[in-house]
Amino acid sequence: MGGEEGMAAGRKKRVGRYEVGRTIGQGTFAKVKFAVDADTGAAVAMKVLDKDTILNHRMLHQIKREISIMKIVRHPNIVRLNEVLAGKTKIYIILELITGGELFDKIARQGKLRENEARKYFQQLIDAINYCHSKGVYHRDLKPENLLLDSRGNLKVSDFGLSTLAQKGVGLLHTTCGTPNYVAPEVLSNNGYDGSAADVWSCGVILYVLMAGYLPFEEDDLPTLYDKITAGQFSCPYWFSPGATSLIHRILDPNPKTRITIEQIREDTWFKKTYVAIKRGEDENVDLDDVQAVFDNIEDKYVSEQVTHNDGGPLVMNAFEMITLSQGLDLSALFDRQQEFVKRQTRFVSRKPAKTIVATIEVVAETMGLKVHSQNYKLRLEGVSSNRMSPFAVVLQVFEVAPSLFMVDVRKVAGDTLEYHRFYKNLCNKMESIIWRPIEVSAKSALLRTATC
C-alpha cells in the first residue's frame, strides 16, 4: 500500500469549502471520497485524481474529456458534476452523492428482478443514453456496476471515463474499450463501429442480466466468449415474457446495421408499458473554459488544501457520515440485516480492540490466499478472481463509532461484484469470533446490527 493510502486513516482534510471524509470508491486512477460542503451542509462525492499519475500514464486527454462530457450531460438519470477544483498536485471533481448503491447489488442479492421492475430501470437507462446520444456523447462502458440507485430507487448512470464525444466528420469509433461481457461484437472486431449501436447492445445485455440474474454471454476463456458474442449465441430463459424476449433478440443482433435503434426501442410495445416520461428542465448553458484552467499550473488559482493528523488511532465516524452511509435518513439501514439489497460497501461491528480486529483480519486474509497490506487501521487485500482473468481487491477500514465499539467497513476496489459478495460472506464466517451481535433487538440496538454477516 502506498504511503498516501496508508496515511489516509490517520488524517483529516479540507479542500476549499469541503470537509473530506472516508474513501467510498476507488479505481485505477482515482479515489472517490465522501465530503461535506461546509457552507451548505450538503453531502457530495469528491473524485480525487493525482496530476503526476495522469501525466505518467498519458491520461490527460481522457480526463479532460471525461470532465467535459460530465459537464455537458445534465439529466435526472445521470450523476451530476457540480464543479471541478485544482490543487497543487490533485484534481478534485465534485459529484452528486448517490446513496442507494449499485444496481448490480440488487441482482447479487435477489438473483433477478421482476419484469416490471427491470423494465422501469431499462426505461430510465434508455432515457439517459438517448439524451447522451442527442448531445453526441457515447458511454462505451455500460454495465450494472456503472448504474447506481439514488435514495428513491431511481437509476443514475455513472463513470464516463471511457466515453467519447463525437467529432464532426468522424462516423466510426475505433478504440476497443468496455467490459468484454457487455461489449458489442463490432467493437471487438476493431474495424470501427457506431457508438450509438454499441451502447444499444450494452443496454440489451443489461436488460437480460436484470431479468435473468446472469449474463447472456459468459465463458471462462476470452476466445470462446468473443465467439459467442460475435455469433449472437444466447437464449432467453422461460420466464421472460414474449415481448421481452422479442425486444432482447432485436437488441442483441450481432449485425449493427439491422440492430434495433434507440428510437425503435422507445416505440416498442413492451418498452412503452407503464412508461412515464422523465421531466427535464431546460438545458443549461455549459462553459468548458474552466476545464482547461484546472490543468493549468497557475498557483493563485489553486484551491486551499489543509490536512490535520490524528493520534494514529482509528478514525472516529461522526453521526453525519453514518447517516449518509444509510439509505435516506434511516440509520437502521446502516446495519439492518433485512435490507432490500446489500450495498457494495458492506460492514460489520465488533467490540474487540481495534488492534485485535486488524490482526484477525490479517490472519483470516492469509488463510484465504490473499496478499495483505496494512497501515493505520486500514487494510488492502489482493488476489485474483476465480476465473483467473482479472485482479480482485478489497479495502477494509476500522472506524470508532462509540467508545469500545468499532465498525469495519469493507469495500470492493477491483473484481466482479458477485464474487465480492461470496468473498464477504466467507470473510464473515471466518471472523465470527470477533463480530458483535446484540442478544436483544430494541429500537436502539437495532442500529448496531450487522449489515449481512
UniProtKB/Swiss-Prot annotation:
A Pfam short name: NAF
Residues of the Protein kinase domain: 18-271
Cofactor(s) the protein needs: Mn(2+)
Residues given in the record as ATP binding sites: I24, G25, Q26, G27, T28, F29, A30, K31, V32, K47
Induction remarks: By drought stress and abscisic acid (ABA).
Enzyme Commission number(s): 2.7.11.1
InterPro entries, per database record: Kinase-like_dom_sf, NAF/FISL_domain, NAF_dom, Prot_kinase_dom, Protein_kinase_ATP_BS, Ser/Thr_kinase_AS
SMART domains: S_TKc (SM00220)
One Gene Ontology MF term: ATP binding
Keywords: ATP-binding, Kinase, Manganese, Nucleotide-binding, Serine/threonine-protein kinase, Transferase
Record flagged with keyword Transferase: yes
Region of interest called PPI, as start-end residue ranges on this chain: 343-372
Record text on subunit structure and interactions: Interacts with CBL4.
Function: Involved in the regulatory pathway for the control of intracellular Na(+) and K(+) homeostasis and salt tolerance. Operates in synergy with CBL4 to activate the plasma membrane Na(+)/H(+) antiporter SOS1. CIPK serine-threonine protein kinases interact with CBL proteins. Binding of a CBL protein to the regulatory NAF domain of CIPK protein lead to the activation of the kinase in a calcium-dependent manner.
Designated name of the protein: CBL-interacting protein kinase 24
Species, as recorded: Oryza sativa subsp. japonica (Rice)
Gene name for this UniProt entry: CIPK24
